[in-house]
């Protein structure tokens, strides 16, 4: 088994996925600057282990996905998104856009402050953090905008 530091942030919030073990077997894994054939064990919402080819143990009760010939990459961090909540939810919300991001392999996003109202006060930033805690399907961060009104 490769040395591996467990993730401290869930791939998805625990409320959105049932607890289960999943073994993705025989994929071409891209990680840490190299590619190799191996397997990944997911325990609940966390990556529990990464195995080189031929080292994969039998995991009782796990759903096994045969990924032979498929590529398996770490989740993408999108550091520049415009989710438009609050104020322009007809264009998108944290809930809708984070789910779309996860469907495309993005596991973390960083949202820009140009919403309505703009995220230029602690109050607006805390509102977005609380909203994401309740609705986001991905890990998140929010930029804080600078303006003439908050230069201090």
Regions found by a protein language model. Give the residues of each.
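Histidine-rich, glycine-flanked metal-binding segment
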Residues: 17-22, 28-74
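A glycine-rich helix N-cap at a beta->alpha junction
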Residues: 131-145
